[in-house]
């Protein structure tokens, strides 16, 4: 946190037991409010319904954010490849195309499950 402050980045401090509205959760996750509602409906994010409003526990939102970040890092690591400077550019382009195909196919199957 101190490093972020020194770098001039914004830092948010909030108690860990705080509950959030869907808009606050969306702001924290960097997504739209409808996306948060969709995540709640799909069961990816836990929420309590109070009247016609959803309330999310800050710990749950932070845990989801960390899990999402880890999935992104894993996807990057999985799609990374070593490129030799002596390798033919056409071979490299074909390897990149194949990596994109694999990632796109994985996304399609994940969307079908959801």
Curated annotation (Swiss-Prot):
A Pfam family the protein falls into: HTH_17
Residues that span the membrane, as ranges: none
InterPro entries assigned to the protein according to its UniProt record, in alphabetical order: DNA-bd_dom_put_sf, HTH_17, SinI_DNA-bd
Domain of life (superkingdom): Bacteria
GO molecular function per UniProt: DNA binding
Annotated coiled-coil segments of the chain: none
Protein name: Uncharacterized protein Mb2337
């Amino acid at each position: 946190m101190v490093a972020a402050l020194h770098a001039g980045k914004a830092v948010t401090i909030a108690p860990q037991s705080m509950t959030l509205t869907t808009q606050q959760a969306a702001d924290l996750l960097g997504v739209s409010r409808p996306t948060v509602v969709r995540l709640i409906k799909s069961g990816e994010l836990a929420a309590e319904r109070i009247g016609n409003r959803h309330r999310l526990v800050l710990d749950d939102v932070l845990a989801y954010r960390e899990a999402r970040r880890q999935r992104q890092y894993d996807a990057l690591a999985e799609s990374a490849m070593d490129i030799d400077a002596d390798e033919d550019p056409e071979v490299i382009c074909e390897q990149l195309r194949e990596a994109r195909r694999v990632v796109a196919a994985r996304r399609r199957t994940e969307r079908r499950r959801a």
